[in-house]
UniProtKB/Swiss-Prot annotation:
One of its GO terms (biological process) is regulation of DNA repair. Keywords: Cytoplasm. The keyword Cytoplasm applies. One of its GO terms (cellular component) is cytoplasm. It is found in: Cytoplasm. It comes from Corynebacterium glutamicum (strain ATCC 13032 / DSM 20300 / JCM 1318 / BCRC 11384 / CCUG 27702 / LMG 3730 / NBRC 12168 / NCIMB 10025 / NRRL B-2784 / 534). The gene is recX. This is Regulatory protein RecX. Modulates RecA activity. Belongs to the RecX family. Pfam families: RecX_HTH1, RecX_HTH2. It comes from the Bacteria. NCBIfam families: PRK00117.4-3.
Length: 199
């Protein structure tokens, strides 16, 4: 018998042994119980991702809170990452794009949010590059103007003016804009609103 025929015979015997073991439920080729656990974790992970995009850390934390086994969670996270259903770079880029445009958030506030979601520093920095400083200033100005429009009376004295100014500056501060820029834009927006009320 030549070498190739010998290899074929060994493979045939190994396949026969595997089929007999599998028929008796003794095969370790496919761990049915483990795959069942993975399917449950994967199902829950996909439900969470269907609600909204999430970072790797955020999804992992949520799955751990549901008391799934950590090694199964890690395998599912790995599968989702390899299939590009879970990607911190895409998540961070979309998070910044949407929150800057729709919520009027500063780059500093967005950086803090991404950090809380477990996105690493390099990925956060790359995502935040899409925010232009001029655009950020325009966003801050729009927030200041919107908040200043809520003033319905002309301040009667300096104390009233300062109170109104604090409200506008507070709106900017909550969105993470720098104090100096916030004060300038708040004063500009409040003064313009007072002029509108006078006319």
């Amino acid at each position: 018998m030549d070498i190739q025929a010998e290899k074929i015979e060994k493979l045939r015997k190994a396949l026969d042994n595997f089929e007999r073991a599998h028929a008796r439920g003794e095969s370790d080729f496919f761990d049915h119980e483990k795959e069942e656990k993975k399917a449950n974790v994967r199902r829950r992970a996909l439900l969470l991702l269907n609600q909204r995009a999430r970072s790797v850390n955020e999804l992992s934390t949520r799955l751990k809170a549901l008391e799934f086994e950590e090694d199964i969670i890690n395998e599912v996270i790995g599968d989702l990452t390899r299939s590009k259903l879970l990607d911190d770079e895409v998540f961070a880029t979309e998070w910044v794009r949407q929150r800057a445009a729709r919520r009027g958030k500063s780059s500093r506030a967005l950086d803090r949010e991404l950090q809380e979601k477990g996105v690493d520093k390099q990925t956060r920095a790359a995502a935040l590059e899409q925010i232009d400083q001029a655009d950020e200033r325009d966003t801050a100005r729009a927030v200041a103007v919107k908040k200043a429009r809520s003033e319905t009376k002309i301040p009667q004295d300096r104390a009233d003016y300062d109170k109104a100014l604090r409200r506008v500056v507070g709106a900017l501060a909550r969105r993470g804009f720098p104090a100096g820029m916030s004060m300038d834009l708040a004063r500009e927006a409040l003064d313009a609103r007072i002029e509108d009320l006078k006319n």
